[in-house]
Amino acid sequence: MERDYWYSVARRAGQLDDLEFIGTQAAQRTLRRLDARHLQTRRLPVIFQAEVARGLLGHLVRAISGGALYRNASFLLDRLGQPIFPDWVRIDERPHLKQALGSAPFDSEGVATCAHDVVNAGVLQSYILDSYAARRLGQQTTGNAGGVHNLFINSGDKD
């Protein structure tokens, strides 16, 4: 038996997808799972669905978060300023977008949030630090107590 799901989130109830659309999406996703087959191991270009990309991005965020860094529990420790992706990848944080779910003028410590690059041209530009982690690492807070705010991945002309 195959199964899948779909959902909608928004700041305002009127912006939510209607129930018929949600049901149709869930049904279509479930049907696409039928007759799946295994492929032999090979190197191929991959396109991730948005839901999968969010999960992968979550792993990156955890690896560059202050807690993992000051505990020496990150594979990206001491990688600031170094390439971690191909040069066409940019990941930036935009905390002040109107109506966006992650928008916030301040982090959970009251520090002002600001737009900035996390990765630019494949190079790690910024860690994700609250005040405590920043002090432990001898750096400045990035206004990310409580997490990140509206991360965007841009791969230039590869989009």
Describe the residue ranges of each PLM region.
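Generic signal for short, ordered secondary-structure residues
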Residues: 5, 9, 70, 88, ...
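Dual-mode signal for accessory low-complexity, basic/Gly-rich regions
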Residues: 63, 77-159
